[in-house]
């Protein structure tokens, strides 16, 4: 699925922040301002978004993992939904410091959550006192909320996709430290520095956020489908029937 300029306009991707909050490093992507609000130049945004999606497609075709990060109220639900649709890990609650740089510790929490889920499935709650069962449920809910979206992630991701890079600067810093490429939606009040694939755009409107997140999820599914198609075609190519002329 390719995103059009019209869709971006309708989603309000071009609305930046109030001019007094601007970050001068975003100047190349700003068209002007209206009623003290910066207007983002979508003629810059669209090709940059397409570049990011091309990278996502290639990564997905090579079985890469892309972690979705968006914990603000307006992005949380759609982000979890679309990451789930694409079969990718996501962080939709608070970013825990060290989620990337200290993944070994996070892995311990993931194991704890999975063990608890298995225990519950096996009927462990029936053998507990009311108080123990309540404590168990509380811990499990807390773990599910903080790391449920990354529990199938075996190691650090190949890239992260961040909605609102300023709000998630710890995630961006951790990725930069580990050399993990960052795809990020950058509004007029933040800096594009440290972002490998910048998507200049509104990061506050739920419609705009839905457009970016769906676009990335679609690109992942397309990349995977293309990879499968190539494997099928290669297999077919190897079995071509060739008639040998006798002579």
Swiss-Prot record:
GO molecular function annotations of the record: structural constituent of ribosome
Keywords from the UniProt entry: Ribonucleoprotein, Ribosomal protein
Gene3D superfamilies per the UniProt record, alphabetical: Glucose-6-phosphate isomerase like protein, domain 1, Helix hairpin bin
An example Gene Ontology biological process: translation
Cellular component aspect of the GO annotation: cytosolic small ribosomal subunit
SUPFAM superfamilies: Ribosomal protein S2
Pfam families associated with the record: Ribosomal_S2 (PF00318)
InterPro entries: Ribosomal_uS2 (IPR001865), Ribosomal_uS2_bac/mit/plastid (IPR005706), Ribosomal_uS2_flav_dom_sf (IPR023591)
Annotated family: Belongs to the universal ribosomal protein uS2 family.
NCBIfam families in alphabetical order: rpsB_bact
Protein name, per record: Small ribosomal subunit protein uS2
Species whose genome carries this gene: Cupriavidus pinatubonensis (strain JMP 134 / LMG 1197)
Gene (name only): rpsB
């Amino acid at each position: 699925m390719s995103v059009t300029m019209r869709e971006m306009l309708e989603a309000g991707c071009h609305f930046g922040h109030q001019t007094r909050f601007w970050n001068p490093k975003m100047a190349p992507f700003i068209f002007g301002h209206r009623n003290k609000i910066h207007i983002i130049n979508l003629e810059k945004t669209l090709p940059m978004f397409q570049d990011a999606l091309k990278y996502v497609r290639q990564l997905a075709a090579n079985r890469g993992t892309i972690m979705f990060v968006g914990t603000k109220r307006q992005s949380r639900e759609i982000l979890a939904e679309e990451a789930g649709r694409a079969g990718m890990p996501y962080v939709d609650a608070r970013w825990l410091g060290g989620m990337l740089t200290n993944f070994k510790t996070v892995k311990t929490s993931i194991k704890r959550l999975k063990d608890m889920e298995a225990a519950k499935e096996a009927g462990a709650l029936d053998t507990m006192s009311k108080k123990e069962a309540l404590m168990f449920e509380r811990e499990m809910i807390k773990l599910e909320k903080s790391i449920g979206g990354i529990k199938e992630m075996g190691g650090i991701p190949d890239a992260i996709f961040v909605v609102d890079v300023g709000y998630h600067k710890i995630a961006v810093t951790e990725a930069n430290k580990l050399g993990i490429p960052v795809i990020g939606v950058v509004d007029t009040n933040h800096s594009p520095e440290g972002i490998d694939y910048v998507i200049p755009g509104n990061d506050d409107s739920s419609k705009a956020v839905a457009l970016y997140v769906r676009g990335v999820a679609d690109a992942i599914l397309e990349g995977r489908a293309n990879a499968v198609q190539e494997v099928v075609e290669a297999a077919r190519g190897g079995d071509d029937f060739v008639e040998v002329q006798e002579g």
